[in-house]
Each structure stands twice: as C-alpha cells, then as structure tokens.
Amino acid sequence: LVPDWLSFVKGIVDSEDLPLNVSREMLQHNNILKVMKKNITKKAIEMMEELSEDEDNYKNFYENYSKNLKLGLYEDSSNRNKLAKLLRFYTNKNPETLQSLDSYISNMKDDQKDIYYITGESKESVMDSPFVEKLNKQGIEVLFMVDAIDEYTLQQFKDYENKKLVSVTKDGLKLDEEDTKEYETLCQKIKEHLGDKIEKVQISSRIVDSPSCLVTSEFGWSANMERIMKAQALGDDNSRGYMMSKKILELNKDHKIVKELKKRIDNNENDSSTKDITTLLYDVSLLRSGFTMDDTKQFSNRICRMIELGLNLDDDDDDEHSENNVNNDTEASNEEEIAMEQVD
C-alpha cells in the first residue's frame, strides 16, 4: 500500500472488503489499491510538511529518514517537487545549520541564476575543497551533498523552481572571464607531458588558493561517484570505464607554482625536474579533488626525488659516498697488512 521509500511508515487502513488472491494470503492488484496507495502517500507527505514547520523537531526526523526522502525523489516523479521542499542541506555559509532549498533561493545573489552544489565523502572534506574557494570569496552559497544516495538522486533531480542545479566540480562552471591567451603554451606543454591522463588543460575560474584542480565533464561521474562505484563488488566494468571520463586539469594562473612553471617552459627548460613538477602537480590535484590514486609507487618515487632536490642530493653524492667507502676499506686493509708484518 505504500511505495518503497515510505517503508518506515506504519499504520492501519480501514476499508471495505478487498479481493484476495487464490492462496488468500495477498491482496489482488486493482484500481482500489492504486487509489489507496496514492492517498496514503499524499497524507504522509502532508504530515511531513506539517512537521517541517518546526525546524527543531524536523531536524531529528530528517536525520533518521533523509535517505528515504531522497529515494522518493529518485523514484516518485509525481511528488518530486513536494519532496524537494522537504530536503535540508548544510552549506558553506551555514556548515552547522540545515538549510532548505527555498531558504537557499531566498539568499541567492541578484545576479545568481543557478543553485550550486558539491558532492563528497563528508562535510569536512567538501568544506576544504578547492572547488569552493572562489565561491567562498564571492559569497555564493554552495549546498553540501555528502550522502552516497545524493549522487543517484541528482540523476533525476536536475532543477528546482526553474533554477538549474550546477555541480561546482564539473566542467562548464563560469564565474569570471579569464584572460588565457598567454597561457596557451603552458597548457599545451602540460597536456603533451601528461598525455592520456587528461583530456585538456585550461585556466580555472573556480580556485583561488590552490595551484590546480581536476574536474570532470558535465555528464560524467564526479570524484565521489567514482569512489562509490569502485566500492561496488558487482559493478559493471564496461559502463564504469565509459562513465569515468578523462579529467580536465585546471590551473590557477595567479599561483606562484604555476607562474614559475610557466617561466621555465617559456624558457625551454624542459629538464627532468620540470617534468616531475608537472606530474606531481597532477598527482596533488588528483588527491585534492577527491579522486583515488592508482599508481602510488610512482607517486612515492616522485616525492622522494623532490625531497632529494630539496636537500641538494644527486647521483654524484651517491657515487662519492661509494668511492669513500672503497677508499676507507682499502686503507683499513693496508693498515692490517702493516700490523701483520710488524708481528712477524
């Protein structure tokens, strides 16, 4: 009598006799049951709407049954807008207080057209994400969607009150116009070095403090969705490879690392350290953007090489150390021979 997402609702329905199947154990499906199911769902939503008027009591209810509401948003298209009004999210402006979508819209800037959100593993991880740096600076509110079910809900929940839901972790986010012409050579060289690891390199309009970040295509999986799908033992490898589209590396043109890298590449300094820095920048972006790293061995080797450079260590130091050991062994051997001759 109730849809799956209302499985937590318990009650008794008083009605006239209903037809049973041959075994007399189950009700036969007929129009009366459909009407009852529709009315029960309607009444349940009305009760939740009344409960939401008291935010303190509704918070306890929402903490226990938010996943059911989001499942309903995914499955029940006829009640999707009503259920969306019942959703609550933490935001970058209100990390400790749950906000409704209506509250978000009322606080939007005059020139803001879309609802921005970020998905992730936890509230703490998305708060420190490089994707919200520029939005924080501009005072734009971002919804934190940190439940695993949010990724599935967003596949059906595309807009609310004629406002599009836009992910801040995907390509296509336009905050400011950036002058990118002088960085074309830098982007091209980095793309050549990283090869098939990325689709392209571009100047970012979303990061302020971080040197770079990795974004996905608008219709591909987010980093959080990739993490969820990799954790599924029975996942389809073919569809996973299709949806895990190549990443786009975005650079912060105002960061000192990017400026120095541009200077070296413009001066044709394509030494091993520059290539290591480029690859390391990609690796760091991979981790900071929420993706998992597959080749940890190569990452560790690059870190060790950068440590050696920082300590002014190179291969010559190793050779010199080896020669000193050989000389010391020779001197010790000669001293032993002299001592034996004196004994004789």
Could you tell me what each predicted segment is?
Residues 1-344:
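Conserved GHKL (Bergerat-fold) ATPase module
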